[in-house]
C-alpha cells in the first residue's frame, strides 16, 4: 500500500532547490590547514549568494551543521549569517546528525517552508579535520576546575601535585562511537565479514569512485557547483578537490595494509574515505517564491526519511533502512529512479548496503516488508564517483550529493534521483529529488 507523503506547502507549492555550491574538498592538513569550519561555511554561503544574485534579505532562515564543533563558535549557523553580510534579523541555528548533518539541515528548512513560517532559506554544513578542538585529560580538566575555585596558593599547589605526566597529554577528538568505543573502520570491518565482502571488491569500488570523479572533473561537469577558494598566503587558488587519484591502478590499492584489523582485515586507507575539510550549501524556496524572483530551480525535494538502528553490530546500514521509506513517501520504486547516489564512507559499507537493498530476506525478516527494495543498476549508481574520491567533510557531504545529483539529472533531461547516507550512531538518511 502506498504511503506517499507529498512535500508541499499549505498553498500546494513544491519545495524548490534553486542553487547549490561547495568549496573544493581538501584532505586533512593540506590546502585548508588552519582554516576553521566556520570560515569555510562563510566562504561558501557568501559566494553562493553572490552567484545567485539573490538579495541576502530574501533569506529568512539559515540552518547549518558542523560535526566536529569548536567551543568558541558553537552556533556556526549564526556566525555565518553575521560574517557574510546577511541581515542580522535572519534566523539561524545549528544541527548535527553526524555524516547526515546537511541532510538534516535541508529537512529542517523544508519543514519551515512547508509550515509557512519562511519562504526561502539556506541549508548546509562545514567541517574541518585540520582545525580540531584538542582537549585535555579528564583528570587535568577536573584539577583545573578545582584550582579555579581554590582560595589559597597552597591549596592550588596541592591540587597540581595530584597530576602525573600522562595527565598532561593532549586529547584529540575520537573518530569513534561514544557508546561503544568502536571506530567507524571497526564497523566497516564487521560489515565486510558479515556480508562476505572481499578486499578485491572493496578496492574495485574505490578505484571506480576515483576514476569516475576524475572523469567528471576532466569533462567539466563540476565547475559550476564548486567555487574557487583563495587561501592565505593567497598565492595559489584551490579550484578542485585534492584527494582524487585519477591515475591510480588496482595494483596500487592492493599494496596497502589493513588500517583497522591489522591481522585479518580488508579495510584500508585507500578503500575508505579520508578525513577532509570543506563546506557545502543549498538555497531552498517555495516554488511560488522562486517564480516571483524569476529563478529556475535546479530541482525539487520529493521526500526524505531518517532511520536508526543498533550501534553494536553493522551500524552503517542507514541506506538499506532509509531508502525504502523515502521511496515509499515519494510514491516511487527503485526502478523509477534515474540516479542513485550513496555516500561511500567505506567501500565495505557501500557494498553491504547495495547487497541488502536487493535482499528479499533482509526486506522480509528485518524490515518487515513484502519485497526487497531492488537491485541497484550500476549504470545509475554513483555515476560521478563518491565520497571515497571526493573526500568527506562530515557535515558538508549531504549538500554536495544533493547539488551534484540535481545537476546531473538536468544534464540527463530530468527525472528522479536518490541521495542516501549512513551516519554514526546507527543513523541513516535518504532523500528523493526531482528535476525537470
Curated annotation (Swiss-Prot):
* Gene Ontology MF annotations: acetyl-CoA C-acyltransferase activity
Among InterPro entries, the record links this protein to:
Ac-CoA_C-AcTrfase_FadI, Thiolase, Thiolase-like, Thiolase_acyl_enz_int_AS, Thiolase_AS, Thiolase_C, Thiolase_CS, Thiolase_N
GO BP terms: namely: fatty acid beta-oxidation
Cite the entry's keywords alphabetically: Acyltransferase, Cytoplasm, Fatty acid metabolism, Lipid degradation, Lipid metabolism, Transferase
**Entries under PROSITE patterns matching the protein:** THIOLASE_1, THIOLASE_2, THIOLASE_3
- The residues forming a coiled coil are none
Q: Which family does it belong to?
A: Belongs to the thiolase-like superfamily. Thiolase family.
Name-wise, this protein is 3-ketoacyl-CoA thiolase
- Organism field: Enterobacter sp. (strain 638)
Amino acid at each position: 500500500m502506498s504511503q506517499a507523503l507529498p512535500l508541499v506547502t499549505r498553498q500546494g507549492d513544491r519545495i524548490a532547490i534553486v542553487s547549490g555550491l561547495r568549496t573544493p574538498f581538501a584532505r586533512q592538513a593540506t590546502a585548508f590547514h588552519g582554516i576553521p569550519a566556520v570560515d569555510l561555511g562563510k566562504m561558501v554561503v557568501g559566494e553562493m549568494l553572490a552567484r545567485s544574485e539573490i538579495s541576502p534579505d530574501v533569506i529568512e532562515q539559515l540552518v547549518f551543521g558542523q560535526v566536529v564543533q569548536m567551543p568558541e563558535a558553537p552556533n556556526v549557523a549564526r556566525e555565518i549569517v553575521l560574517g557574510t553580510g546577511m541581515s542580522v534579523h535572519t534566523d539561524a541555528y545549528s544541527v548535527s546528525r553526524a555524516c547526515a548533518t546537511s541532510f538534516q539541515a535541508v529537512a529542517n528548512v523544508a519543514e519551515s517552508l512547508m509550515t509557512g513560517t519562511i519562504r526561502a532559506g539556506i541549508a548546509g554544513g562545514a567541517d574541518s579535520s585540520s582545525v580540531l578542538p584538542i582537549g585535555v585529560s579528564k583528570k587535568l580538566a577536573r584539577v583545573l576546575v578545582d584550582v579555579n575555585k581554590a582560595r589559597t596558593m597552597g591549596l592550588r599547589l596541592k591540587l597540581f601535585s595530584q597530576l602525573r605526566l600522562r595527565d598532561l597529554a593532549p586529547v584529540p577528538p575520537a573518530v569513534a562511537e561514544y557508546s561503544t568505543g568502536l571506530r567507524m573502520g571497526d564497523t566497516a570491518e564487521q560489515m565486510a565479514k558479515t556480508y562476505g565482502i572481499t578486499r578485491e571488491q572493496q578496492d574495485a569500488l574505490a578505484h571506480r569512485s576515483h576514476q569516475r570523479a576524475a572523469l567528471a572533473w576532466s569533462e567539466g561537469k563540476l565547475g559550476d557547483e564548486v567555487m574557487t577558494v583563495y587561501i592565505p598566503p593567497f598565492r595559489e587558488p584551490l579550484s578542485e578537490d585534492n584527494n582524487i587519484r585519477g591515475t591510480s591502478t588496482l595494483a596500487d590499492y592492493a599494496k596497502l595494509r589493513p588500517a583497522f584489523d591489522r591481522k585479518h582485515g580488508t579495510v584500508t586507507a585507500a578503500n575508505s574515505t579520508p578525513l577532509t575539510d570543506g563546506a557545502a550549501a543549498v538555497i531552498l524556496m517555495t516554488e511560488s517564491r522562486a517564480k516571483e524572483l524569476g529563478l529556475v530551480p535546479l530541482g525539487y525535494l520529493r521526500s526524505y526519511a531518517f532511520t536508526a538502528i543498533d550501534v553494536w553490530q553493522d551500524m552503517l546500514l542507514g541506506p538499506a533502512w532509509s531508502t525504502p521509506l523515502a521511496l515509499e513517501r515519494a510514491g516511487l520504486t527503485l526502478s523509477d529512479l534515474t540516479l542513485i547516489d550513496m555516500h561511500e564512507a567505506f567501500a565495505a559499507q557501500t557494498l553491504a548496503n547495495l547487497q541488502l537493498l536487493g535482499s528479499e530476506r533482509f526486506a522480509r525478516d528485518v524490515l518487515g516488508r513484502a519485497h526487497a527494495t531492488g537491485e541497484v543498476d550500476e549504470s545509475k549508481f554513483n555515476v560521478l564517483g563518491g565520497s571515497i574520491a571526493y573526500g568527506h567533510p562530515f557535515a558538508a557531504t549531504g549538500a554536495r550529493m544533493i547539488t551534484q545529483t540535481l545537476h546531473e539529472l538536468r544534464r540527463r533531461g530530468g527525472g528522479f534521483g536518490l541521495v542516501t547516507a549512513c551516519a554514526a550512531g546507527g543513523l541513516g538518511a535518504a532523500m528523493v529529488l526531482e528535476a525537470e
